[in-house]
């Protein structure tokens, strides 16, 4: 009884033990599955191997299952470690015991290698470095190296591209900058292309006065901005020509003579401002200095820029006008005096005839009337006969006027003529000023004049 009871108890314990072992195995499988899922969720960090405590509690019945699971876990670990170690440099595979530590070391090594490579690539020097020269310096270099010291825009760009790789790579962008610097800086002068020289574009050269534009001949620094001096004013150019003694011979080889011709000669009349009709025909005055003439022309143009040109001077009078004007003392003829007289007076004077009519016919202030050279032969004979009669008649003083005439006939005649002319001038001028002339005024003055001559 006792033996059977013990056997039954032993068999019960064995069954319980088997059940417990099977239960533990299932629990272990569940824990291993959880570990596998946790390792897969960590992205290849490696699954944990079952600990030794769990192995001790397992029974012999579940050892085969555990070995299969361990092999599967090893395969999963290898597969997970290969993608993580792929960016690392080739080397020995990490040991199974290293786990996630080997993967982290490989990742750190790969990161360090990548950082070193990036630093090496960024430290390399770029060959396309912009030259330290301005556009004016580049243009000056191109012009100075040319044989004729002149280049077109395309030739300047070609020189810069061949000399500097930076501008060769960026050619279309800076060509307009070269064109603008050529046009806006006074140190560059544009030269038109010759008619027989085919091609496109004008030539560009350096102004001769811009030689000291750069400091000590270095193109890195410009001393000052060059300003072209303005052209000489007309009066300054005329003064320069006068100082150099520019004449017909000198002006033939002087280019300035063509730019600034001498001023035109002044008019031949002495009274140019009022015209030649208001004065005598005098010899032309000396021409003014070219300096003053040019200055006067420039001042007139400055004050009256839109004024019309002055009218041409009137033509000079004929050569006989001076003699005619000198013959008539005050510039009017005898017909002017006759026209000033009323009609009845003119008719009476003509009908009366005699010396009064002759005196009225000619001007009383002419040289001929004063000297008496133009009298007719009848008047001259009457004057001689009256003089002879008066000379033969005895006077109260014994000799009378005959002695006086013999002593100084010319002086007496001159005095009488001057007195008569003065009296006639006063009477005629007053009458002409009043616009009226009484009948017989001119005739009475002439009769008094002839009576004085006859009395002498």
Swiss-Prot record:
Tissue expression per record: Predominantly expressed in the CNS and temporal half of the retina. Also expressed in the condensed head mesenchyme, metanephric blastema of the developing kidney, cortex of the adrenal gland, condensed mesenchyme at the base of the follicles of vibrassae and cartilage perichondrium of the developing vertebrate.
SUPFAM superfamilies in alphabetical order: Winged helix' DNA-binding domain (SSF46785)
Biased composition (Acidic residues): 15-38, 62-77
Region (Disordered): 1-104, 303-322, 381-401
Keywords of this entry: Developmental protein, DNA-binding, Nucleus, Transcription, Transcription regulation
GO BP term, example: pattern specification involved in metanephros development
DNA-binding span(s): 130-224
Subcellular compartments: Nucleus
Disruption phenotype: Mice show disrupted cell identity in the ventrotemporal area of the retina and aberrant morphogenesis of the optic chiasm. Their kidneys remain fused, have a disorganised ureteric tree and fail to ascend to a lumbar position.
Chain intervals with Pro residues compositional bias: 86-95, 306-320
Positions with biased composition (Low complexity): 381-393
Protein task: Transcription factor involved in regulation of gene expression in a variety of processes including formation of positional identity in the developing retina, regionalization of the optic chiasm, morphogenesis of the kidney, and neuralization of ectodermal cells. Involved in transcriptional activation of PGF and C3 genes.
Official protein name in the record: Forkhead box protein D1
Organism: Mus musculus
Gene that this sequence comes from: Foxd1
